[in-house]
Amino acid sequence: MPATAPTWDPAQYLRHAGHRARPFTDLLARIPDLPADPPRIADLGCGPGNVTVLLADRWPTARITGYDNSPRMLERARQYAGPTSGGGHLDFAPADARSWTPDEPCDLLVSNATLQWVPGHADLFPGWIDRLAPGGTLALQVPGNFDAPSHRLMRELADSRRWRERLAGVLRHDDAVLTPEGYLAHLTAAGCTADVWETTYVHLLPGDDAVLDWVRGTGLRPVLDALDGDPAARDAFVDEYRAVLRAAYPAQAHGTPFPFRRVFAVARKPEGSGGSGGSGGSAGSAGCAGSGGSVGPAGEAGR
């Protein structure tokens, strides 16, 4: 795990917005009814906000706050801020997932393709669950493709003789996320009922070097950051990586197939549970306010 999370390019990230949004819609479909109306919802690691708005479609009266610690992502997301068509409200605020804690109870805390950037994130679950309202839900999705060629070849290249010294410790490894069984164990130990599953999507990506174009927006960001001051070296790494990706993911007549495994969890806090949760709160609240809200190392929006 890099010492600082990577910087983000919203335009590059959104080049595959439809494919990246599909896991979020699948996660959304498995979230049960929320205990309050209007519900209070926090989206931790909201990125450019394009999927945060889907929460308002599901819960039109909700007061929703999207959190991220990338200023560029938040700037893009704020185009969606304001009253929603169902009478709710959507806003965005800076926060770092490693230190964020809700200041008021949430009915739903959702985190989509963010927690892989947060070492030891499962240790944060008890505190988050404690701040859920009784009957509230913690829902998350993380990429589970760290053993796929896209990531394995990147790590192997970064660890090669040419690049090892410059890129040591930059890339995440397969321990960045837990197994489905691991998430189930943590969430049930925190007192929740949990629905945990995995899905492998086979995206058909258009264009030349499509897998490279995908990872430029996400997994490759730490390498691009590390070599940012040396454009020649950065381009040389990308050229080497492009060559091995072409062999691993050959283009076909209608695009490049790109299998991508993801892990999901939906954990519901019991209705009668204790802790700090509750369904009170002022109607003017824009969502689950959070402490630890200063902008940290840019980029909780990794997908």
UniProtKB/Swiss-Prot annotation:
<keyword id="KW-0808">Transferase</keyword>
<dbReference type="InterPro" id="IPR029063">
    <property type="entry name" value="SAM-dependent_MTases_sf"/>
</dbReference>
<comment type="function">
    <text>Catalyzes the S-adenosylmethionine monomethyl esterification of trans-aconitate.</text>
</comment>
<dbReference type="InterPro" id="IPR023149">
    <property type="entry name" value="Trans_acon_MeTrfase_C"/>
</dbReference>
<dbReference type="GO" id="GO:0030798">
    <property type="term" value="F:trans-aconitate 2-methyltransferase activity"/>
</dbReference>
<dbReference type="GO" id="GO:0005737">
    <property type="term" value="C:cytoplasm"/>
</dbReference>
<dbReference type="Pfam" id="PF13649">
    <property type="entry name" value="Methyltransf_25"/>
</dbReference>
<protein>
    <recommendedName>
        <fullName>Trans-aconitate 2-methyltransferase</fullName>
        <ecNumber>2.1.1.144</ecNumber>
    </recommendedName>
</protein>
<dbReference type="GO" id="GO:0032259">
    <property type="term" value="P:methylation"/>
</dbReference>
<feature type="region of interest" description="Disordered">
    <location>
        <begin position="271"/>
        <end position="303"/>
    </location>
</feature>
<keyword id="KW-0963">Cytoplasm</keyword>
<dbReference type="InterPro" id="IPR041698">
    <property type="entry name" value="Methyltransf_25"/>
</dbReference>
<dbReference type="InterPro" id="IPR023506">
    <property type="entry name" value="Trans-aconitate_MeTrfase"/>
</dbReference>
<keyword id="KW-0489">Methyltransferase</keyword>
<keyword id="KW-0949">S-adenosyl-L-methionine</keyword>
<dbReference type="GO" id="GO:0017000">
    <property type="term" value="P:antibiotic biosynthetic process"/>
</dbReference>
<feature type="compositionally biased region" description="Gly residues">
    <location>
        <begin position="272"/>
        <end position="303"/>
    </location>
</feature>
<comment type="similarity">
    <text>Belongs to the methyltransferase superfamily. Tam family.</text>
</comment>
